[in-house]
Amino acid sequence: MNYSIVMFPSKPFQDTANGYRRRYDAHYANIPPHITLKERFSIAEEERSKIIKALRTIGQTHKPIAIDVYKVDTFYPQSTTIYYKIKENDRLLALYEALHRDPFPRKRAHPVFVPHITIAQGLPQSEHADIVGQLKMIDVSHQETIDRFQLLKQLDNGSWAVYETFLLEGD
């Protein structure tokens, strides 16, 4: 089975992101706006309980995370993905790193962690240039504290569903 680990921002901020995703993201219907902490990984059913136990421990030892969304950016030329960029911070990076150690699969989809919330992807290059130009003119300033993260499971239709939620309860 395929799994992923994410954090969801508040519903009002998801609504803001979805305003763009509806138009510019082909994956809009598959998953709400989120911060990916661990890209898709596969584990056997018998390994799942070990992973869940590790996630509970991580939740108990990590504090809630303040996020600061401060601009629109793009991964161009690697891809035409456009996203809300989140300022890196020690707590977010520590949580990300904890999810890339044993017992989790260590493979990283990208060499560098860029905290973000995708608002557009899979755009043709010509359309990307126009859209990113417009979106970069928008003043973006959003702060919130997120006190939980989710283990998602990929369903047969390609969409993602929350399998379990873990509170960030560290001291």
From Swiss-Prot:
Record: active site: 34 (proton donor), 116 (proton acceptor)
SUPFAM superfamilies referenced in this protein's UniProt entry, alphabetically: LigT-like
Name used for this protein in its record: Putative phosphoesterase ABC1741
GO MF annotation: an example: hydrolase activity, acting on ester bonds
Coiled coil ranges: none
Location of the motif HXTX 1: 34-37
EC number(s) per entry: 3.1.-.-
Superkingdom, natural source: Bacteria
Sequence similarity: Belongs to the 2H phosphoesterase superfamily. YjcG family.
Enzyme class: hydrolase
Motif HXTX 2 mapped to chain: 116-119
Claim: Hydrolase is one of the keywords in the record: yes
Keyword Hydrolase tagged: yes
Organism: Shouchella clausii (strain KSM-K16) (Alkalihalobacillus clausii)
Keywords attached to this entry: Hydrolase
InterPro entries registered for this protein in UniProt: 2H_phosphoesterase_YjcG-like (IPR050580), Cyclic_Pdiesterase (IPR009097), YjcG (IPR022932)
